[in-house]
Structure formats: structure tokens, C-alpha cells
Amino acid sequence: MSSFEGYHPLLTPNFRFDWLTQFRLKQVSQLTHQDLAETAEWVNATMRHTMARTALTWGIERRATHKLVGWGGFERLNLQQKTGRTYLTGPKLPANEQQEIVNRLVHFAQEELGLDDLELEASTNLDTAVLAAAGLLQRGDVWHWQRH
């Protein structure tokens, strides 16, 4: 795909992944703990990276409540080398919800982006059992997946 435009919204049984511009700025601001001006600047910067195909960031909304629960996606994307780093930011969610989101991110990296090498930095908001169940292996502070 020549642009990332078709990569939104993404749906899982319980979550909707969409561009941060599709959410109310106040909701995003509450999660980032920044004022509205700083948040707007940050959202614009993330969208510039998305349009440049160097990153891909979605707001993640709980579908049942329409509540923004965090954001995640990919950074350090190099589509020619088929490498990138995935992340999930926001408050810690229950393990089953973490699993649904992480599985979607890993599958997206493999199937849609065609990555051969994916990293995820260890985080206190993600359970290690969730990461292992998604097929990631821990190497120090970084979790890693590699196509064989």
C-alpha cells in the first residue's frame, strides 16, 4: 500500500483503532497529561510521521463505551528493511484486553506491514505473559519477534 490511509479504523471484538485526529482533543489530552495546545501539536506530529510512513499511531477506543483507553502502533518503521518497533501507551488494562490489542499489533506488523523484525520495549503497562503469548521473546529490556 502506497499510503497508510486505508489502515483506519481497525476493529477488534472490543476495540477500535483510529487516527488520533478522530478523537476529541480533550480525551487525548487527558491521556497524555498535556494541555490542549501541546496535545494538538503532538497529534499533528504523529500524523506527519504516519503520512511519511515512518510511524503509524492509532488512538485505541473501547468500542462498548467509546472511551479512549490509550494509543499504540509502530515507530522506527523501515518498510524497505522490514523492521519496526511496536508500542502500547496508556493506563494498564486487564490482561485479556492487553492480549487483544497486542495480538492485533503483532498480526498487523506481520500481515499488513510485512515486517520481518519487530521490537517492543518492556513496559509496566504490559504483562510479560501477554507479550510471550503474542509470540515475542524477551532479550533484556526489549521484546522481539522475528520471521523465520
Q: What does each of the following model-derived ranges do?
A:
Residues 96-105:
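Conserved acetyl-CoA pyrophosphate-binding loop and the N-cap/start of the following alpha-helix
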